[in-house]
Amino acid sequence: MKKLATILILCGMLLTSVIPAMGMDYGDYLNSALEFMQDMYYLDMDDEEALKAALKGMFGELDPYSGFYDNQETQMINDSLQGSFVGIGASLEKCDEGVRIVRVYEDSPAERAGLRDGDIILAVDGVSTFGKEPSAVAAEIRGEEGTSVTLTIQRPTGRLDIAVQRGLVEINPVSWRIEEDVAYIHIESFTSNTSGSFQKAMDEIERRGITKILLDLRDNPGGYVDEAVAVARKIVPEGLITKLDFKSERLSDKEYYSDLKNSPYLLAVLVNENTASAAEILAGAIQDSGKGVLIGQKTYGKGVVQNMFYVLTPEAYAKYGKKYGLHYITSVEWLSYEGVLLDPDDLLGTIKLTTGHYLTRNGRAIQGVGLAPDIEIADRTLPNGIDLALINPLKNTATLTLDAYGDDVCQAEKILRAAGYFNGTPDRRMDQETQEAIRKFQAENRIPATGDIDAQTRDKLNERLDALRAEYDPAYMRGLSLLKSF
């Protein structure tokens, strides 16, 4: 209920008191169309199913970004944009024995309980996972915050039961590292916690006196405009960031500004054809400000914005209409105009609607056009599915041996997979498959084939990482080289 109230207030702030006159009344016509669909369609559907189908068709045909979503679909959208969810914090994949954990999220209930990448889940609360899809197992693991689930785990050392208390899982959309005098920052998407995570990176960057930033926005689909603006305000000098221009008089146009004086940062921004929406707002603000260059391919060109509107059930629509003598279909209208906060049971789902477009600092409209890079260069390729830019160089000081566990093991497996030595899924455990790949790598590089990652093997793996980036990610290398030249 608290999340719903917050979303409604945020939407309500956009609505003004201007209510345009209604057009033609299609009430009887639409009712007849719904009755015809229910009668003639070969499968049975109740009134609510028919209404949802009609709404999906009505809004889904407007453009690729608009649509109607029922309450379950709405929750999934909200979870993805919030950057957090209630669960244990583990990604799963199918394997012969059941389901394998391929990633345990940092500081998650799963990590605190002692689960590890590579653990095989044999049972959930005593119920076997054999033959089940990962999505089905994930549904069995999910539950209310504060409750517990017991997972039967298979490891090389044996079988054990681990009880995990479900809780809030935060997904960090920002990753970063320092390479000599350059900070590399990758933003995956603009969820509700992006700017906070970005600030943590900036705190360390400022502490170390670094002013050169390689910002990776490739494949970033966008997200919350406010979050992209908040990031821009930390690195873009004072002036307009973007302007939102809405068609409806009930939505107030909005301009976002940066107040940052004398920005010290020199920026190289990696973009490609999948850099879209809010990511283009940030990239456009950097380009127009003259504080950075775009490197890569022309961006996607999504220069329009959407709003989410909760819509009432027909029963709630009739109930509130009778009580107030008004006919609003969305909860944000009831909140903005009448101060009525609806109960979640009154809601059928949400309409995501394209309501306007945005302009860059210099007044560019990029819908269907995109942002042209200052330096056009071929996009990266992902050898064996590995994004080389996201690999951190190995830093281990102690030799990593069989059953070693940690981030360095995961990074080594990614390098080995990209180079064709390792066929498994990179995780944080060094098992026999990992060691066999290391032995092949060591033998080809004239290193004693122990299967362990000692200092010599570590350095050779880091050298291979540099060589792979040069071969497969020219945009990354160009950005890094450009910044280091200053």
Residue ranges: model-predicted function:
Residues A110-K132, I213-D216, A437-I447:
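Conserved PDZ fold ligand-binding element
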Residues M40-R100, S148-V164, P173, D473-M477, ...:
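Extended, small/polar residue-biased N-terminal targeting/export presequences
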Residues T399-L465:
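Short acidic, glycine/serine/threonine-rich helix-capping segments at coil-helix boundaries
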Residues P109-I120, R142-E144, A285, A418, ...:
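A short glycine-leucine-enriched loop at secondary-structure breakpoints
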Residues L122-I210, D253, Q367-A398, L465, ...:
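C-terminal, low-ordered peptide segments at domain boundaries
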Residues M1-G23:
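Sec-dependent N-terminal signal peptides of Gram-positive bacterial secreted proteins and lipoproteins
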Residues R207-L214, N220-G385:
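Conserved acidic, small-residue-rich alpha-beta core segments centered on
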Residues D25, E106-D119, N172-P173, D408, ...:
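PDZ/PDZ-like domain micro-motif
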